Amino acid sequence: MKKEDMLSHLKAFDPAIFTFLQDEIQRQRCTLSLVPTVNAMSPLAAFLEGSALANSSIESCVAGHGNYIEELVRTRAQELFGSEHAVVRLGNIAAASRVALLALLQPGDTVLSFNLRKQEHCAGLNYHFENYGIDPHLQKVDWDEVMQIAERVQPRLIIFSPVSYPRIPNYERLAEVTRTVGAYLWVDIGQCVVLVAAGLIPSPVALADVVSFPTNDSLRGPDGAILLCRKAIAPQLEAAVANTGHIALHMNHLASLGFALHAAAQPKFCAYGEQVLANSKALAAALESRGISLLCSGTETHLVLAAPAAGVDLMDAAQTLCRIGVHVKVDKIPTMQPQILLAALRLSSLNPTTRGLKETDMDVIAEVLARVLAGALTEGEEDTLRMKIAKLLMDKPIFSEEWMNDAFARIDTSSSDTGSIHEHAAHERMSVLKNLFR
């Protein structure tokens, strides 16, 4: 069925869903998200997830067929990150986190976690969490103090999940702390996976027992997660995977994930990562030049933590930015002193980069952010800033063809839906499926 016929049938049969679809496409086209966990999915990965492969799961397919695709995806993950083992049949990062916890810990064990990360995934599980974080004044991790805490609390597991830390971590020092107290080390690289995969920032894989990350956002794949681990503890993780019910992942998800991993091994993905870094640094510099304070002295990743001026309510600022057409994440950054939380907007260059924005565009975005964070908007200026963002996004697609593989660069990704991509892929279905996983 052609895309026009399909949309016509959808509109007639379910106008509520049709309207929701059209409104959401319009929202994504006409607004800009700086939220770290929001990014556009690769059109080819989206095609595979919506393909006939959705009709089969690993559990239901013919003998060996499902194992082939899972092993292919596993091998790609291991080769991309230099890991001894990979678990790829996980539906989301929360599920992956519970698998890791169940595999590594016994009830009552102590966990030393950066900003108490992963505690939110422990419902019904009996672990004792201790916190470490950044120094509230220096706004960086004091590894000597982390060592002192670890020696005092003697954790079974140390977690580093720096979703609110824009600096490059000292993984060697963290591994030293872990070895000193005889603990496991688990690092969640989160949205930094693009920078690790592209070799633009250090990888913790060689030093950590477990490394986790979501497969959407910066990897631009389907919603899911991957666990990388040492071969010695692979049986523990695989047992936890089976015991938590991850036995029937659909082949469309695995194929989509396999494509995303294959794309991440290509030079264009490295170029994408380089632009992500260039954009985040340009955004940070442009904000600072306009008097906006940045936590942690700037950025070395995709992340920028922008603090408001004195007296500016961050929630009000976020709502103002939303009306202007810019979506942001309000955060309170924990520190080594529990009573001190650092308020900031957690901004990411991932989605702007995917849409094709460059350093000069970051300057425009910084101008809008700075006016709101400074609490300096004059009457009628909100409309002016809204028009500025609308003009910036006028010719920007949801997923820029700049980041497409050369074979698909001619696909029109700026259309109001992905129909042209599906149509193109349908015409070349046999050749795509034959050559996709070389």
Regions of interest found by a model, annotated:
Residues L21-T31, N39-G64, V73-F81:
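Glycine-rich phosphate-binding segment of PLP-dependent enzymes
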